[in-house]
Amino acid sequence: SGSGKSTLLRYILGLEKTKTGLIKLLDKEVSKLNKKDLYKLRKRIGVAFQNGALFSSMTVRENIELPLHENTELDEKTIHIMSRLKLELMQLSGTESLMPSELSGGMLKRAGLARAIIMEPELLFFDEPSAGLDPITSAHLDNLILQLRDALNMSIIIVTHDIESAFKIADRI
């Protein structure tokens, strides 16, 4: 705690500018990108935030579909199908019309994860995925992360203080 893990993630994502050093992400030097190019780069990655980062005034489905509405020209039917599939993948079928306040902690994280993967990113970042979860829910989330990695064949970077989860999920630490 307090060792700079989340700060490092903010630097990698270009949310904060580095004072020294070099960060390359998907063959792009993050600190040298202008706003337009940084926006393009961020469309190629997904981020699952510690608290799910869902908008409280939107339903689960609206939250998950938001990146598609903002970044694609897909029709509404296709967007609904994609969000339904991601919800099924996250074991959240039937939660589409719920508000974030109606979800448990584990459900919030899975809904945030569904939104993080809706654009089918090349790279997925997790910020403290097990924070605030009981050991059983944390273990289920670890298994879900492994299933996603294998099913979607994507690279995943996890910021965590949970040593057990790190060793279970990681290929490299």
Predicted feature residues:
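Helix-to-loop junction immediately C-terminal to a conserved catalytic motif
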Residues: 13
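Conserved ABC ATPase "signature" region
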Residues: 29, 76-94
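Conserved ABC ATPase signature
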Residues: 99-103, 107
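A short, proline-enriched helix->beta-strand linker immediately N-terminal to the Walker B motif
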Residues: 118-122
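Catalytic Walker B motif of ABC-type/P-loop ATPase nucleotide-binding domains
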Residues: 124-127
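Helix N-cap at the start of a conserved alpha-helix in ABC-type nucleotide-binding domains
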Residues: 135-137
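Helical segment within the ABC ATPase nucleotide-binding domain
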Residues: 139-152
